[in-house]
């Protein structure tokens, strides 16, 4: 902006300060008298600096503006519009009602990891697919002896992993340290495709994995991975406890069976560039059989910003354990979403509560296993303890000591039917979810596209009866 012969320029309209420049380029700001109709505004308490002008002034501009006798340099033009010669006005973001210029340059958090392509072949997928990170299998196997209900064999989990690792690229007795540490959502859905209500869409996902993962052992790997998930539920080492969210795939580098994947772990998926010049931007997509619009199912309307969740649904029927995974959108936060999950998956909730203890080989309960509350309260000889003395062992040691035996009885773990984690949100009043069939190699697979997903993974929330 050329100043010409002007010695000052007004920034804003109805401002409390005016910026002056001299021949040396020095800048000073002076107050102006209040325009007619605008009251004085006291800043702070007591006597001090008094400003005049509109409630919203552009006092932040000195940090963005560098003035010389001939020009004004604006460091960040995002959100600035020129309304007339010599006048600069800030364009207000009507959606966020914010003056933050940085909102036009959203921050991104990218993550990268090297993995074997046993459970995730990035060449067969498109950017935007959710990727799941797997913990080391020894963590699950090590926790199975303590979590397995009495009467069930914790070694079944070790045997299921051994059978699966025989089909791994690295083999069962690998000592290189490389392992399949990432899992694609399509592979996870394909391994349990028989459990989804939309059979045609689920079979299309399985056909896509079999056709495009380019490994003759892919079908066996899918079957054994599904059996491994069943063994995790049977031993109460639930899959969600050993899986975390990696992010939305954007690019990869692959050589033989080793791949380096880059994903968006925080921020808007469309804000990151892919390594495909034909499609430089990507949106999140999920298999259609694994997508769930909770608000639509509950008939709550669609015009609202939505959260995005990843849900694991379990069935604890012995030897017929079930595992399903969904990506769901809903206006509910993490607390209210649990009630929606309980309503939508009431069959799994009831079945897990009834059959979660099947096969338990626990000892018979002692005749006096129940707390004799009525006898204790009616007996005058039993010691009492006032509430103010509950932290005093001298008083509590004399009370009736009751240690119940919960082996073989229903508990929170045996009644667990689901777990969910918030992946992020779609910050739009009218979020767009589009279902269409996409071509993956020689296979057509129905998918659902989610636009403007902002990744912000949280913690797992477990649901029990």
Swiss-Prot record:
InterPro entries reported in the protein's UniProt record: Herpes_1
Subunit structure: Interacts with TRX2, MCP and capsid vertex component 2/CVC2.
Designated name of the protein: Triplex capsid protein 1
Family (UniProt): Belongs to the herpesviridae TRX1 protein family.
Keywords on record: Capsid protein, Host nucleus, Virion
GO BP terms in the entry: viral capsid assembly
Function, as annotated: Structural component of the T=16 icosahedral capsid. The capsid is composed of pentamers and hexamers of major capsid protein/MCP, which are linked together by heterotrimers called triplexes. These triplexes are formed by a single molecule of triplex protein 1/TRX1 and two copies of triplex protein 2/TRX2. Additionally, TRX1 is required for efficient transport of TRX2 to the nucleus, which is the site of capsid assembly.
GO cellular component, one term: host cell nucleus
């Amino acid at each position: 902006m050329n100043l010409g012969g002007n010695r000052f320029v007004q920034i804003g309209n109805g401002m409390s300060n005016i910026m002056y420049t001299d021949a040396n380029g020095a800048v000073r700001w002076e107050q102006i008298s209040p325009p007619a109709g605008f009251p004085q505004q006291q800043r702070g308490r007591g006597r001090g600096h008094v400003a005049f002008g509109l409630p919203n002034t552009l006092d932040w501009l000195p940090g963005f503006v560098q003035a010389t006798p001939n020009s004004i340099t604006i460091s960040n033009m995002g959100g600035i519009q020129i309304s007339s010669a010599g006048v600069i006005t800030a364009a207000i973001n009507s959606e966020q009602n914010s003056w933050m210029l940085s909102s036009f340059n959203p921050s991104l958090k990218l993550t990268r990891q090297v993995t074997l392509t046993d459970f995730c072949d990035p060449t067969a997928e498109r950017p935007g697919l959710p990727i799941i990170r797997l913990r080391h299998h020894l963590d699950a196997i090590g926790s199975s002896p303590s979590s397995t209900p009495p009467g069930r064999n914790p070694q079944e989990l070790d045997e299921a992993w051994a059978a699966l690792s025989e089909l791994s690229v690295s083999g069962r007795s690998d000592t290189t340290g490389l392992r399949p540490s990432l899992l694609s959502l399509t592979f996870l859905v394909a391994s349990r495709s028989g459990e989804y209500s939309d059979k045609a869409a689920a079979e299309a996902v399985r056909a896509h994995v079999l056709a495009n993962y380019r490994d003759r052992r892919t079908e066996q790997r899918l079957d054994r991975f599904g059996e491994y998930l069943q063994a995790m539920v049977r031993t109460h080492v639930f899959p969600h406890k050993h899986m975390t969210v990696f992010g939305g795939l954007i690019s990869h580098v692959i050589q033989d069976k080793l791949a380096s994947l880059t994903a968006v772990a925080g921020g808007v998926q469309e804000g990151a560039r892919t390594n495909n010049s034909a499609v430089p931007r990507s949106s999140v997509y999920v298999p259609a059989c694994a997508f769930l619009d909770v608000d639509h199912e509950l008939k709550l309307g669609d015009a609202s910003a939505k959260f995005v969740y990843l849900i694991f649904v379990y069935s604890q029927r012995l030897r017929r354990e079930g595992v399903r995974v969904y990506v769901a959108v809903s206006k509910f936060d993490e607390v209210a979403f649990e009630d929606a999950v309980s309503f939508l998956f009431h069959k799994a909730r009831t079945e897990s509560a009834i059959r979660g203890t099947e096969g338990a080989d626990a000892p018979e309960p002692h005749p006096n296993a129940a707390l004799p509350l009525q006898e204790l309260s009616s007996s005058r000889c039993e010691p009492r303890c006032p509430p103010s003395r509950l932290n005093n062992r001298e008083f509590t040691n004399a009370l009736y000591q009751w240690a119940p035996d919960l082996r073989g009885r229903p508990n929170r773990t045996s009644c667990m039917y689901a777990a969910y984690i918030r992946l992020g949100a779609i910050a739009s009043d009218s979020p767009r979810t589009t279902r269409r069939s996409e071509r993956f190699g020689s296979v057509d697979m129905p998918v659902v596209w989610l636009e403007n997903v902002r990744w912000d993974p949280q913690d797992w929330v477990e649901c029990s009866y």
